[in-house]
Amino acid sequence: MKRKVFITVKTYPTLSKKYDELVCTAGILDDGSWVRIYPLPFRKLDYEKRYKKYQWIEFELEKNTSDMRPETYRVVNCATIKTIDDPIGTENYWRKRKEIIFQRNKIYKNLSELIDLAHENKLSLAVFKPKHLISFHVEATEREWSSDKLALLQGKVQQLSFFQTQEELRKEFSVVDKLPYKFFYKFSDEEGKESRLMIEDWEIGALYWNCLKKEKGNEQAALG
């Protein structure tokens, strides 16, 4: 079925043994409900199909039966992806964005309630508003993608090299730089329950690389 989705979530790319490079994308359907679009090889899309956050897009969707989370769908054919107008801006304190996201969606403030609903498989996407933002954390992690995933990609390149040009192979199998750090928020909910959540948004990766470039490769200066 063809649906319109208002994109609100786009993660930094990761490598998958099954699907190569992936970006987890989520947003609000035109009926106000949440949707997760998975898998979606974002960087392989033609430039005009590369959507931005807070932009309406249209494509053919069907339920992803390999993922039991209720909101998960997959794109039937990436060629059907169509961006609609420009991304919605931040004018009037994000008024238009808020109308689309909050009009039909509950704002959760109790984390235990959300966790219980997730355990019952009633939802896996929601709007959550912390009571307090306590701190921001940075942790070092592996600096390179795992060798087994890279080996699988290389094997696919070798299999396809007889049928595709080098330019086509570069487009399909170029690997995004791996972030050498993980970023977290620590926060509390309305009951005072403290939690830590990893930040996986595309923007956190872009911010790190931009700061690193600005600081001429000095990682500690880039991390602030």
Please give the residue ranges for each predicted region.
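N-terminal ordered "arm"
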Residues: M1-T65
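Nucleic-acid-binding small beta-barrel platforms of the OB/S1 family
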Residues: D85-G224
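OB-fold single-stranded nucleic acid-binding module
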Residues: E62-V76
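Short edge-strand/loop segments of extracellular domains
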Residues: N77-T83
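Surface-exposed beta-strand edges and their flanking turn/coil or helix-capping segments
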Residues: L40, K49-K53, T72-R74, I88, ...
